[in-house]
Design a protein with these regions (language model features):
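Alpha/beta-hydrolase-fold serine-hydrolase catalytic core, especially in secreted/extracellular enzymes
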Residues: 2, 6, 27-36, 50-52, ...
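N-terminal Sec-pathway targeting helices
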Residues: 1-16
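Domain-level recognition of soluble alpha/beta enzyme cores
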Residues: 22-125, 345-349
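Primarily recognizes the serine-hydrolase "nucleophile elbow" in alpha/beta-hydrolase
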Residues: 206-271
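Active-site machinery of serine-nucleophile hydrolases
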Residues: 65-66, 76-97, 136-183, 312, ...
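Short substrate-entry loop that stabilizes the transition state in hydrolases
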Residues: 104-165, 285-288
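Alpha/beta-hydrolase active-site loop
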Residues: 165-225
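The feature captures the conserved acid-bearing segment of alpha/beta-hydrolase catalytic domains
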Residues: 117, 254-320
Length: 389
């Protein structure tokens, strides 16, 4: 028996440096984000939006584009000025070790490409990141939607996002009072609600800017090309709660998706009138004491909406954090095996992102493009998906 134990200990000791070495190699490996599944090429631009009330947002816009020559380089995942700040924020060597070298991530977006002329105008989707994330951290979802004929707009708000780097070189990090990890209980929930309300107002401001861009874009790119009568909103985590809040607040929203976000505030009692979908991770992997209240709030919203305008989907084995590009970048089978052993995930990260992109684009196709509702109930090829109601 002692001999067996010694052998197991020796194998463990030998496995550690191998695991560390493979993880370090994975950090530097070039990673191409999942290829968009739609027929359009994808373009990307940024806008610095301001108004007299001192609201300022750094917006990223992905859109259906005219295809360019295959040899043309795609946009950086993050511009160099952003990358240096994000790398600095990561801080410790361990954090660098466990995360991706962003300079090695390849997108499918062409910088400043001409918007596609296949349609006279395109519906608009506003995308809101989670609490600590940058909107570019959801590039896989944005590119896929753009490839299906949507103009996708995401923004990073100064003081309420981990960091914003403006074109003039200003770097604005999140204000200490917006760090929810430093709070707990009722104080944390109240501050989260305040952030949701502020972000909802930001979405309204972003749509105001898009209306101006549609009427008088100096570059001519988006002039008359934005169909602002067909606006959808989705977000992840606290951004998902924001998507529902904005649809509650503003009739310009025609459909919303909450991706694994806990609803907050008055929408729990009042719900929303627009079609909505909850796209959820596998909460069976979490304690019922934590998920019970969230499920009750989702049920409250769900029960107040007609049956043909609501949907709740769970991706079995999905992890909360892998709806972002964190899932899309996780290609190492070894690291996935470790996450499964730790109980942090049961399905491949890229698989989770693929399922999410399918259901997000299909939902908006149904409610913004009048695709058949039966498309949302087509489970072919997605055995991990469970329709809750």
């Amino acid at each position: 028996m002692r001999k067996v134990i010694r052998i197991l200990v020796l194998l463990a000791v030998l496995a550690i440096p191998v695991l560390l070495g493979l993880t370090w190699l994975d950090h530097f490996r070039e990673t191409k984000l999942p290829h968009p599944t739609g027929p359009y090429a994808v373009g990307r631009v940024t806008c610095d939006w301001k108004d007299p009330r001192h609201t300022e947002l750094l917006a990223w816009i992905w859109y259906p584009a005219v295809p360019t020559h295959p040899s043309q380089a795609t946009s950086d995942y993050l511009p160099p000025s952003w990358r240096s700040v994000v790398e600095h924020q990561r801080g410790t060597l361990l954090t660098h070790f466990l995360t991706r070298d962003l300079s090695r991530v390849r997108t499918h977006s062409m910088g400043d490409a001409k918007i596609s002329d296949q349609q006279p105008s395109y519906p608009v989707i506003v995308m809101r990141a989670g609490l600590s994330g940058l909107v570019t951290g959801y590039t896989s979802l944005a590119e896929d939607l753009a490839s299906h004929g949507y103009v996708v707009v995401g923004f990073d708000a100064p003081y309420r996002t981990s960091v914003v780097v403006f074109p003039d070189g200003r770097v604005i990090e999140r204000a200490p009072q917006n760090n929810l990890d430093a709070l707990d209980g009722a104080e944390q929930e109240q501050r989260a609600l305040e952030l949701v309300q502020a972000w909802s107002a930001n979405i309204g401001f972003a749509l105001d800017q898009l209306e101006r861009l549609n009427e008088s874009d100096p570059s001519g790119k988006f002039l008359g090309r934005l169909d602002l009568q067909r606006v959808g909103v989705f977000g992840h985590s606290l951004g998902g709660a924001t998507a529902l809040q904005f649809c509650h607040d503003d009739g310009r929203c025609k459909a919303a998706i909450d991706v694994d976000g806990a609803p907050l505030g008055d929408i729990i009692a009042e719900s929303v009138t627009q079609p909505f979908m909850f796209l959820l991770s596998d909460h069976s992997m979490e304690p019922e004491t934590e998920t019970g209240p969230i499920k009750a709030n989702i049920r409250s919203i769900y029960d107040r909406q007609p049956g043909d305008r609501r949907l709740e989907i769970v991706i079995r084995g999905a992890n909360h954090y892998m709806f972002s590009d964190d899932g899309a970048m996780l290609k190492s089978p070894l690291l996935m095996r470790v996450l499964r052993m730790l109980g942090l995930a049961r399905i491949d990260g890229r698989r989770q992102v693929a399922i999410a992109t399918h259901y997000i684009s299909t939902f908006f196709d149904v409610y913004l493009k009048k695709a058949p509702t039966s498309e949302l109930k087509n489970q072919a090829g997605y055995p991990e998906v469970e329709y809750i109601h």
